[in-house]
């Protein structure tokens, strides 16, 4: 079996080094990292190239142009369809998958059972004091963001289900929240934790930019839930002094390392997360697969 990784990287590349190391540790052989830039003057472009070079890698493609909600799906689909029989780990740069058993065992279970993809759900990582600290490359991200819990589900109230692993010929919903083709491996076999390292110092300016760009019309708004969730999170942070309230019971924040068993409430949460899975495709996405237009690179 061949295991590939695909992700689209924008201007916020602080997690790139940690992501490559993490997924290599899971057994990924080939990395298809796509760089999206609006201008080649992007100061992070060379830094991201340098990170890849340290691992003997290069960008699979560089796409220059304005961002829109469908872009990541276009770029990811263009890579996956080149190797339709291989297995692809699909993740945003701030998403670190954790499984309860080796990836090769999970893929074998899929191939033996005739399954085409694996599901999981977001588990947000938060600093112990609830602040939004800057990434420190000298310290493990698991230690910097030592708590795990349900910020996206309970505050943003966004869809948290994710396709984490899929054959290259599977058609994914935008955002990888589900799939329109293929069969899902039962959650009893594998249900991935998607550790979500979003809550850093860059999140506030990114959320603010998103709301402003959508409100002004600079970005075309296809999915209204996107801006609603961003506004909700900004309002929450303002009300809490720029922090996440780590004492709030509804967020279920717990000390958590990098092992699947570290987050104690997970087993009890999975049934609830599975109930939300069908909602992901029906409500968060308008029932369409990732587009398949041609993308150079």
Where do the PLM segments sit?
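Short beta-strand/turn micro-motifs composed of small residues
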Residues: 9, 34-37
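Catalytic-site signature of metal-activated, phosphate-bearing donor transferases
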Residues: 72-74, 99-297
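N-proximal low-complexity "stem/linker" segments adjacent to membrane-targeting elements
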Residues: 1-24
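Short loop->beta transition adjacent to catalytic acidic/histidine clusters or analogous donor-positioning motifs
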Residues: 2-3, 24-35, 57-58
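Short acidic/polar active-site loop segments enriched in Thr and Asp
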Residues: 29-30, 86, 116
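Active-site-proximal specificity loops/subdomain of glycosyltransferases
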Residues: 36-91, 98
């Amino acid at each position: 079996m061949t295991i590939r990784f695909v992700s689209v990287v924008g201007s916020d590349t602080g997690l790139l080094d940690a992501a490559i190391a993490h997924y290599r540790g899971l057994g990924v052989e080939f990395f298809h990292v796509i760089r999206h830039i609006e201008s080649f003057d992007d100061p992070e472009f060379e830094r991201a190239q340098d990170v890849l070079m340290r691992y003997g890698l290069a960008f699979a493609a560089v796409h220059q142009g304005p961002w829109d909600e469908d872009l990541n799906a276009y770029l990811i689909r263009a890579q996956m369809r080149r190797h339709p029989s291989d297995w692809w780990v699909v993740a945003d740069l701030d998403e670190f998958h954790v499984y309860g058993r080796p990836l090769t065992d999970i893929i074998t279970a899929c191939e033996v059972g005739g399954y085409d993809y694996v599901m999981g759900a977001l588990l947000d990582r938060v600093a112990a004091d609830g602040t939004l600290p800057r990434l420190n490359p000298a310290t493990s991200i698991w230690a910097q963001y030592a708590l795990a819990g349900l910020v996206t589900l309970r505050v943003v109230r966004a869809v948290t289900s994710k396709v984490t692993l899929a054959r290259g010929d599977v058609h994914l919903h935008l955002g990888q929240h589900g799939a329109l083709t293929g069969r899902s491996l039962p959650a009893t076999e594998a249900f991935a934790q998607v550790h979500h390292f979003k809550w850093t110092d860059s999140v506030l300016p990114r959320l603010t930019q998103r709301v402003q760009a959508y409100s002004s019309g600079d970005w075309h708004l296809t999915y209204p839930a996107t801006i609603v969730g961003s506004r909700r999170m900004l309002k929450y942070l303002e009300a809490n002094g720029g922090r996440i309230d780590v004492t709030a019971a509804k967020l279920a924040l717990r000390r958590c390392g990098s092992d699947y068993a570290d987050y104690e409430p997970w087993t009890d949460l999975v049934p609830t997360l599975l109930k939300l899975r069908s909602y992901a495709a029906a409500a968060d996405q308008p029932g369409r697969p990732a587009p398949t237009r041609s993308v150079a690179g």
